[in-house]
Amino acid sequence: MARSVKKGPFLDDFLVKKVDVLREGSRKELIKTWSRRSTIIHEFVGYTFGVHNGRKFIPVLVTENMVGHKLGEFAPTRTYYGHGVDKKAKRR
């Protein structure tokens, strides 16, 4: 079920404050965050966020196409090594 329109997108307040501070100083640096649940809004376009994946911070450059998605969608938490190889087929 989608979030109600009258509530608006979910954002952690500290994340908006960090972007405002960078905007005033007109700097473009990495914004580290553990808030994977925050929705990307238009004000975030052009900034690079370091989204924590449980082990390290993954740099995510926000583009116009990402607006409306969550930050966590762009920092995968699991490493995929492929499916197991059949040992019988490998011997041949």
From Swiss-Prot:
Domain of life: Bacteria
One Gene Ontology term of the molecular function aspect: rRNA binding
GO biological process: ribosomal small subunit assembly; translation
InterPro entries per record: Ribosomal_uS19, Ribosomal_uS19_bac-type, Ribosomal_uS19_CS, Ribosomal_uS19_SF
Keywords per UniProt: Ribonucleoprotein, Ribosomal protein, RNA-binding, rRNA-binding
Pfam families: Ribosomal_S19
GO cellular component: cytoplasm; small ribosomal subunit
Similarity field: Belongs to the universal ribosomal protein uS19 family.
PANTHER family the UniProt entry points to: RIBOSOMAL PROTEIN S19P FAMILY MEMBER, SMALL RIBOSOMAL SUBUNIT PROTEIN US19M
Protein purpose: Protein S19 forms a complex with S13 that binds strongly to the 16S ribosomal RNA.
Name of this protein: Small ribosomal subunit protein uS19
Gene source species: Magnetococcus marinus (strain ATCC BAA-1437 / JCM 17883 / MC-1)
Gene symbol of the encoding locus: rpsS
